[in-house]
Amino acid sequence: SNGGENADGFAIKLHSGIGNILENCVADNNSDDGYDCYAAHGAITFKRCQANYNGNCYGIKGDGNGFKLGGVDNKTSGVKPHLDPLNHVLTNCSAKGNTGSGFDRNNQNGVVTMTNCTGDSNKKYNYNWPAKGKPSALGYEVTFGRAKIVNSTSINGKNNISGADLIGKCNG
């Protein structure tokens, strides 16, 4: 058993197709992540999506990120570990009350743009966007492309945004 891992609300991961657009989607109360883009192969567009209270479903616990926006693929048999730099776009999205981070880089090395987004009361960070990653399955520390956080808000939580540029009116 893997606890609550991989019980995501929306799993656009592990070699998913390109051109995925999610609009007006809600991912609430999943034991793992609300939206998981681990090892996706194409940039994903999110419009007006919500991720709330993920990471603990009736005591079954996973990572608990609202939007997990990257990751290295080192688990697929026959596929060499790799990081795909993907330029995901999130517009008018919100993440509230997740046990992990609301918006989590998870080793995404593309330039992700988050516009008019809100992180509220997420346990780890509202925005978790460090400049560098831990040594990965590839065996080296990853230096990332910088995220763009545009006209966005952080409420009742902390942020790790050394790998992001704040543009326009950002609060919190």
Could you describe each region identified by the protein language model?
Residues G19-E23, A43-C49, T76, P85-C93, ...:
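All-beta strand scaffolds that present successive hydrophobic residues in beta-strands
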Residues I18-G19, N52, G102:
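Low-complexity, intrinsically disordered or weakly predicted helical/coil tracts enriched
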Residues L14, N24, N29, A39, ...:
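Residues on the solvent-exposed faces and adjacent turns
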Residues S1-H15, N29-Y38, G59-P81, G97-N106, ...:
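Extracellular beta-strand/beta-solenoid scaffold signature
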Residues C25, Y35, A43, V89, ...:
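A compositionally biased, intrinsically disordered/low-complexity signal enriched
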Residues G55-C57:
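Gram-negative outer-membrane beta-barrel proteins
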